[in-house]
Amino acid sequence: MSDDVLGLDQPIKLTKRTKISKIDLDGLMDKQKGLPFIISSYRKPLRVIERNDQRLAAKLEKKDLTSSQRRRLKYDNEFQNLQAILQFYQLWCHGLLPKAKFRDCIYLLRSFGARDTSLKRYRKTLIEAEINKKKEELGLAVPSEQPSTTQEYSKSEQRVNEPDDFFSEDEFYADPQDENLFVRPEVPHLEDIPNESYDAEMELLREMDS
């Protein structure tokens, strides 16, 4: 009979934890995979949404549709538009952090953005530049030179229609690769992450667009 009742002589099984790359400012500022990519490519999901809306308008022209059928078509269209936006950011997160789940990537981005002062200043610069642009369009401000931070990305935005190797628009219609896209119980709620907000600036942008 073995004297090792407690199993102290048994080999210990060690499980390897999946390593996730850390987010840093250099990675977020990378032109190919960082925030500049979103600035230069955000029109791609917008074109998908525009096509979806055009198809919806054509379907709604049919006079034999019931009210419930119309509501269903609108619901399906909103779902497809939301799916296109989510797919865009999922593909971007996969390029930024290939080993991270989508929800994990969002958590890391929110957490990093809440404490990094350089990223906060960068974000505020983009928001202020967009507000000034809206004011100029509405004639509320005299046109001025764009900050150097946005000039570089405005040039890259002009190349948005050029093909790139990062992803194609067809990928918006592919099934999400992340099986745990919405359910990650081990990850803290995003609302629990402290984050500096610019609610006043964003509210002003919404009022200008309305």
Curated annotation (Swiss-Prot):
Keyword terms of this UniProt record: Cell cycle, DNA damage, DNA repair, DNA replication inhibitor, Meiosis, Nucleus
Molecular function as annotated in GO: DNA binding
InterPro entries with a match to the protein in the record: Csm3 (IPR012923), TIPIN/Csm3/Swi3 (IPR040038)
GO cellular component, one term: replication fork protection complex
Endpoints of the signal sequence: none
UniProt main location, coarse: nucleus
Stretches assigned to coiled coil: none
BP GO annotations: DNA repair; DNA replication checkpoint signaling; meiotic cell cycle; replication fork arrest; replication fork processing
Region (Disordered): 142-162
Subcellular location: Nucleus
Domain of life: Eukaryota
Pfam families: Swi3
Family membership: Belongs to the CSM3 family.
Record's function text: Forms a fork protection complex (FPC) with TOF1 and which is required for chromosome segregation during meiosis and DNA damage repair. FPC coordinates leading and lagging strand synthesis and moves with the replication fork. FPC stabilizes replication forks in a configuration that is recognized by replication checkpoint sensors.
Subunit structure of this chain's protein: Component of the fork protection complex (FPC) consisting of TOF1 and CSM3.
Protein name: Chromosome segregation in meiosis protein 3
Gene for this chain: CSM3
